Amino acid sequence: MIVDNAVIMAAGTSSRFAPLSYEKPKALIKVKEEVLIERQIKQLQASGIKEIYIVTGYMAEQFDYLKEKYGVCLIHNPFYLSRNNNSSIWVARNVIKNTYICSADNYFSINPFEKEVNDAYYAGVFTDGYTEEWCMQEDADGNIISVHVGGEKSWYMLGHTFWSERFSNKFLRILERQYDFPETADKLWEQIFIEHLDVLKMKIKKYAPSDIYEFDTLDELREFDASYKSNSRSLILKNVANRLQVFEADIMEIKTIKGNDTAAIGFEFSALGNRYSYYYESKEIMSMK
């Protein structure tokens, strides 16, 4: 089937990617000198997918330049703080047909997109060792028949998905029925998919581990792009390093601090064997000894 378009989800706050995601959306961070979402847009366009929608939410205005630069369309998700990513699917529902559903913060070392696709699929990477990711099992026809968190010697969910129009119609009908249920708000769209594997048929599209990357934290990004060790591109971390008289590379093991409303209010970090906390509003650095 011919791919109609692509929807790139870029609405979330990515609070685990502290403090860089406090300063700008994670999708707009450069990896190996290329803006994450721009790389993905260019890969889609190179594959013949010209109709591209970006679902925005957090710091939405920072994505505006993409309209003129790449001719993409922006769809705003006003529910990005109160709901999980099922709300991004919901606000884009009118354009989802034979559609790539992508996450803005994935880095593809190869171009995984094609203009013609045979079946609905979820990209997967194989692991021999144990992982906390969502592990998939398939039947003899290659259809996903179960998904569970954590496993070994398994294909796990990582990267983009392709929805056939048939899959899209079925999923969107289910989402419409369940959208206003209180328990739906916190669900990933993947959880809704998993709850209906009997009617939502999707295969595993298998990739090598070196094909798809996802960076949940600055420490993970530094493993892939070593330039971030000496230059974090973060004014906050530069200020912290200056005040503590350490190098940026000495600041590591960063963990987000959340307030009562689950919004990020700061982060913990280690530097030269000591543990500290930093709070965005007060700019205070506190020793955690």
Where are these regions (language model features)?
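Short acidic/polar active-site loop segments enriched in Thr and Asp
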Residues: 4, 50, 97
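Conserved beta-loop-beta/alpha segment of the NTase-like Rossmann-fold superfamily
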Residues: 64-135, 140
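N-terminal nucleotide-binding beta1-loop-alpha1 segment
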Residues: 1-22, 71, 271
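A conserved acidic beta->alpha catalytic loop
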Residues: 58-61
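Conserved core of the sugar-phosphate nucleotidyltransferase
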Residues: 109-184, 255-289
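Catalytic-core segments of class I nucleotidyltransferases/pyrophosphorylases
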Residues: 143-212, 219-239
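Short Lys/Arg-enriched alpha/beta "domain-start" segment
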Residues: 229-260
